[in-house]
Structure formats: C-alpha cells, structure tokens
Curated annotation (Swiss-Prot):
UniProt name for this protein: Zinc metalloproteinase/disintegrin
PANTHER family linked to this entry: ADAM A DISINTEGRIN AND METALLOPROTEASE DOMAIN, DISINTEGRIN AND METALLOPROTEINASE DOMAIN-CONTAINING PROTEIN 28
Ligand binding (Zn(2+)): 333, 337, 343
Provenance organism: Protobothrops jerdonii (Jerdon's pitviper)
First and last residue of the signal peptide: 1-20
Length: 481
C-alpha cells in the first residue's frame, strides 16, 4: 500500500520537475515551474479594474528573484477598432468591441537596464521577457494548481520541423507611384533620429487559418491580439507605435485565391486591399495571415518600400508556429520590408539573429540591426511616407451613414444618435448652426479648443498632446502648427 502511494505521489509531482512538456508554444525540452505573485499597487478600498494600467509580478528564475514591471499598452487598439466575419450567405458582420480594458502589457525586469517584456495577462501570464540578455517565454500550466507557470528559454522550444524557415523576398521593389511629401511637423531633438510614427494595422485571417483553430473566432482574436502586442513592442525602439485598426476573418470562404506562390498571393491581396478593404476603413498597412504552405521554405513576403501605397503596403505571413512570438517576429519582419529594410547581410550587419535576418534562427531576436535602422532612416528621408505621420483618428472609418452608432460616418458631420447633444442636429446628422464640433477631446461646448490646449497628458518621454485649434481630434505627441 505504501509503495503504491509513493508511485502516485511521484506521478503527481513529475510535471512540475519534468524536462519535457507540451505547451501552447510547442514541445519544450527544459522548463522551470514558477508561481508569479502579484504585488498590488492600488490603495486599500480602491475599485480594482479587471486589468490594471500598471502591474508588478515577482517570481524566481534559476533561483534568482525576478520582478516584472508591466504597463498596459494603451495605444494597441484604435478608438474605432472593428472586427468583421461573414454569414453563410456572404453578408459582412462587423462589430466595434470595447477593448479599452484589455490585458496586453509591456514593460521591463527590475534592475536590468537592457530588459524588455511583452505579456498578456488575460488568463495568467503569457508572453516573453528578456533577462540578462536571454530570451525567456512564460505561459500558464494547465494544472489543477492555477498559479503554476512554465518559464523556458526560447532556444528550448523544439522545432516543429527541421526545414529552415525564411522570408521569400529576394529583391528590392520600387513603386512607380510617388509617395506624397510630408508636411512640416514639429520634432523634438530626441526624435530627430527616429521621429514618432504611427502604423494603423489591418489583419486579415484567411479561411484556412480560421478552420485551423476550430472555426473559433475567440481563439483567432486572442492569438492576433497577442501577435500585435508583440509587434508593437518590437517596433518601439524605432519610435513606431503599432495600432490594430481592424481584424477581418474570412470565416466562410477566402475572398481572394490564396496560392502557394507567396508573391502572387501578396499581389492578389494588395489588389483586394485597394479595391475593397481601404474603402471600408482607412489604415496604413495590411497583413494576410494564412495556413497555406508557401512554395519552398517561405513563410512570409512583402514589398520592400511599399508602406503607404494602396496596393503595395501589404504582407502575407504563414501561421507557421504554435508559438505566437515566433509568428509575430515574422510579421514584424515583413513590416520592416514595407519600411524599406532589406535582409541583414551576415558579413556587414554583425547580427546573426536580428529581425531582418533572412532565415529564422534558433536564437530568436526581437531587435532590428543597425543595418535595418539605416535602411529605415533612408526610407523616411527619401520617401517621406505621409500615412504614418499621425495617430489614428475617429474619422478613419468609411461606411454608409447609420445614425447613432457612435462613429462619424460618410455623409455625417456628427453622430446623431443622441438627441441630448446640442451640437448635433438629430434630424440631419449635421452640426447645429454655429457649432464647429459635436464631440472629441478638443471640442468644448460645440467649439474647437484653443491651439496649444493640452488634450492628453504625456506618457513616457513624449510631449503632451495639444489641440490644433482647427479640429476636435487630439493629435498625438504635440505635433501641431
């Protein structure tokens, strides 16, 4: 009886000590079980939101204490973020979910100046953090003990197959269409190397990927949100803010012919974006996530220097790994191409595993090489891409007028859903006589606020956002006049 009991205990303990386990991120060779403890920053009696703006977690890795400082990524979703899927008869079903209180955070490790972190706190902690130069991943263990998490190095995730995975871009591309010259904007001295830029991102999921995840829209949404959170964090060193503007899931059938030849699929997707997607909602760059096996070892493709072009500001990426972070690196890689970046030359760039490496490395990096930064600076200087100058505004939605949907539609000067708004004529959806505006952070009593009036306090090193005196919208980063 005692022997049987001992065997039972060993079997129960083994998952906590094991050297191999199958996780969402793949089959992991070596991992450590940790129990993150949340350090509450809210005062006693305060009402706690579902996901706090700032959080701190403590746990141990290799016996050493690790303290994660996390902040909510407040710019991750546009104010009019939308999700679209399709009915069996082909009708579009578009919703505008509230995503203000989301669970996606970025941050750093205490007392590690070079550390970074990108963590989803939706159901436990899932994401990655850089600690003492090493990339670690963390995710909850599906055990009865709900506090248990697995922490493991990226290099300990087994490859799903032995074939090298690479980007299919082999040559440069230059648009025949000139990109509109940027207007002069105020830039602080600190922003001169990499001025603040904003990319409104549209993600389209093909039917193959939708069925891959059991035709479960919630699974797709969660995975895409995690990807975009990672992309945003990787683009931050370039002073680029990534904002998810829309998610379009081809739930019934593909709306283009998704082909094994990645450049062909990208071309068809670019045509569809120009013809259909941009007419529904303005955005700067679109990516097609697919489950198709591209020819050869290709997992992604994008036009070099295509950003802000209606047809060429696109990329196509295979959902090639169960590990969200790995796919997010590929998506960031294709955005890099659109921003003028070529592949890293291993002899010149001295970065074996940076984001723009042509082949995925066992030592996955989330950094852009100096070569990539130079390419990006050249692209900004020579092409002056206008579409990424400003943060997303409410008026980026384009659709037929529908009163009272809380968005400014084509043909409307104001949203006329509320008869209590004195600035908007409920019968015509036009501004009331004498009114300049009906709502917005720079609208006060139907008039534009004065130029220079603070409309959004600064976060981090950016300046306060101030009204222009010419609009009800609050521009990002004090870029006015």
């Amino acid at each position: 009886m005692i022997q049987v009991l001992l065997v039972t205990i060993c079997l129960a303990v083994f998952p906590y000590q094991g050297s191999s386990i199958i996780l969402e991120s793949g089959n992991v060779d070596d991992y450590e079980v940790v129990y993150p403890q949340k350090v509450t920053a809210l005062p006693k009696g305060a009402v706690q939101p579902k996901y706090e703006d700032a959080m701190q977690y403590e746990f141990k890795v290799n016996g050493e204490p690790v303290v994660l400082h996390l902040e909510k990524n407040k710019g991750l979703f546009s104010e009019d973020y939308s999700e679209t899927h399709y009915s069996p008869d082909g009708r579009e079903i578009t919703t505008y979910p509230s995503v203000e209180d989301h669970c996606y955070h970025h941050g750093r490790v205490h007392n590690d100046a070079d550390s970074t972190a990108s963590i989803s706190a939706c159901d436990g902690l899932k994401g990655h953090f850089k600690l003492q130069g090493e990339m670690y991943l963390i995710e909850p263990l599906e055990l009865s003990d709900s506090e248990a998490h697995a922490v493991f190095k990226y290099e300990n995730v087994e490859k799903e197959d032995e074939a090298p995975k690479m980007c299919g871009v082999t040559q440069n591309w230059e648009s025949d269409e000139s990109i509109k010259k940027a207007s002069q904007l105020y830039l602080t001295p600190e922003q001169q190397r990499f001025p603040q830029r904003h990319i409104e991102l549209a993600i389209v999921v093909d039917h193959g990927m939708y069925t891959k995840y059991s035709s479960n829209f919630k699974k797709i949404r969660k995975r895409v949100h995690q990807m975009v959170s990672n992309i945003n964090e990787m683009c931050r060193p370039l002073n680029i803010a990534i904002t998810l503007s829309l998610l379009d899931v081809w739930s019934e059938k593909d709306l283009i012919t998704v082909q094994a030849d990645a450049p062909t699929t990208a071309g068809l997707f670019g045509d569809w974006r120009e013809r259909v997607l941009l007419k529904k909602k303005n955005h700067d760059h679109a990516q097609l996530l697919t489950d198709i096996n591209f020819t050869g070892d290709t997992i992604g493709w994008a036009y070099v220097g295509g950003m802000c072009n209606a047809k060429y500001s696109v990329g196509t990426v295979k959902d090639h790994s169960s590990n969200v972070f790995v796919v997010a690196v590929t998506m960031t890689h294709e955005i890099g191409h659109n921003l003028g970046m070529e592949h890293d030359d291993k002899d010149k760039c001295k970065c074996e595993a940076c984001i723009m490496a042509p082949v995925i490395s066992d030592k996955q990096s989330k950094l852009f090489s100096d070569c990539s930064k130079d390419y990006y600076q050249t692209f900004l200087t020579n092409k002056k891409p206008q579409c990424i100058l400003n943060a997303p505004l409410r008026t980026d939605t384009v659709s037929t007028p529908i009163s009272g949907n809380e968005f400014l539609e084509a043909g409307e000067e104001c949203d006329c859903g509320s008869p209590s708004n004195p600035c908007c004529d409920v019968g015509t959806c036009k501004l009331s006589p004498g009114a300049q505006c009906a709502d917005g952070l720079c609208c006060d009593q139907c008039r534009f606020k004065k130029k220079g009036k603070i409309c959004r306090r600064a976060r981090g090193d950016n300046p306060d956002d101030r009204c222009t005196g010419q609009s009800a919208d609050c521009p990002r980063n004090g870029l006015y006049g």
